Design a protein with these regions (language model features):
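Conserved pre-motif I regulatory segment
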Residues: 13-98
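Inter-Walker segment of RecA-like/P-loop motor cores
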Residues: 149-191
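Conserved SF1/SF2 helicase motif Ia
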Residues: 94-103, 108-136, 312-313
């Protein structure tokens, strides 16, 4: 059966006890951090309500609440227990935010981290990502946001932790810190403070996972396969876990723990990202080698055209692959072609 993806998104209650969670104090913070990007505000708000309103004990209670009201979910699973058995991170306040690439995931991650620290929901935030490149980019963005005077001025007086220190796991993770690390560092026996800083303290730690589809899908990289095991490790006993991705699919199946979705189509319609022009694959050549050369010719000709048309901005052509090994192979093939 084919489902409409939006129908599979779990809806977070908008009616909750304001005495338990007061987000009105954070309105100015939302406005300065997100500007007019309402979808970012909505995503942060839904995440914080899920984690901090007291309406949910775990992802299971959110599923139960939605399953009763949603016919599409009832068609996807034979009953609510069947649904709950298939959750990837059970018995946690765990969920995924599906945000199209290029729509500002880093703002969401920072916003959720700062509010969770400010509300005293947690003492520390651990942001995990799959590579050094992503780690470096996130740290740089977070340092700018944490040091932004306009953002600082919006933080409520009641906020417990303000202007969090942005560190990596080479430093001891203290209360009020946002630690940004790539998943490989979690398994290094020397140099990483994650074990010492977080063991037995997981219930007071928020774990935010960038590019979370790496956890849910099979990978040839051993450390990536261990990522999920780390999140479920009883030695840490993490309670609050969120994932962020622009590709919330396991093979062709949409993730079953998504609480907010902002699709690429919606982003294009809202002019948040540019329209995507797809190159159709020709079936003229039967040989895989010939097809690859034809594809490279198209890409090269396209690049040359952009160089002429946009000569003042040095156009880049970016080739995206499934993983590092495929990228290395593609690099060699492209060098041979050129």
């Amino acid at each position: 059966k084919i489902y409409k993806t939006q129908d599979l998104v779990l809806q977070v209650k908008q009616n909750y006890n304001p005495a338990k969670l007061n987000l009105k104090k954070w309105v100015d913070f939302f406005d300065v951090l997100c500007g007019d990007r309402e979808f970012q505000k909505e995503a942060i708000r839904d995440a914080i309500i899920f984690l901090a309103s007291g309406e949910y004990n775990s992802i299971e209670s959110l599923v139960e609440d939605n399953f009763r009201k949603n016919d599409e979910l009832q068609k996807r699973y034979k009953d609510v227990r069947d649904y709950q058995r298939n959750l990837p991170l059970p018995h946690k306040l765990s969920a995924v935010i599906d945000l199209a690439t290029g729509t500002g995931k880093s703002y969401l991650i920072y916003g959720i981290a700062q509010i969770a620290l400010g509300l005293d929901l947690v003492d520390k935030v651990l942001v995990l990502c799959p590579s050094l490149t992503i780690e470096s980019g996130l740290k740089e963005k977070f340092e700018k946001l944490s040091g932004d005077d306009k953002i600082k001025a919006t933080l409520p007086d009641s906020a417990v932790f303000k202007n969090p220190r942005i560190i990596d796991a080479n430093s001891t993770i203290k209360n009020g810190d946002i630690c940004v690390e790539n998943i490989h560092a979690v398994y290094e026996r020397t140099g990483s403070s994650i074990n010492d800083s977080l063991k037995k303290n997981g219930e007071r730690v928020l774990v935010l996972n960038d590019e979370v589809h790496h956890i849910y899908n099979s990978s040839s990289e051993q450390d990536i396969r261990k990522w999920k095991a780390f999140l479920l490790n009883p030695d840490f006993n993490f309670k609050y876990i969120l994932g962020f991705t622009g590709t919330a699919y396991m093979d062709d199946e949409y993730f079953n723990d998504v609480i907010y979705r902002y699709s690429i189509r919606q982003a294009v319609n809202d002019k948040v990202v540019k329209s995507v022009d797809y190159v159709a694959e020709d079936e003229v050549s039967s040989s895989p080698t010939e097809r690859k050369r034809e594809k490279f010719h198209k890409i090269y000709d396209n690049h040359e055209e952009f160089v002429k048309r946009y000569r003042l901005i040095k156009p880049l052509t970016i080739l995206v692959t499934k993983d590092i090994s495929k990228a290395k192979t593609l690099r060699e093939d492209l060098i041979d072609f050129l």
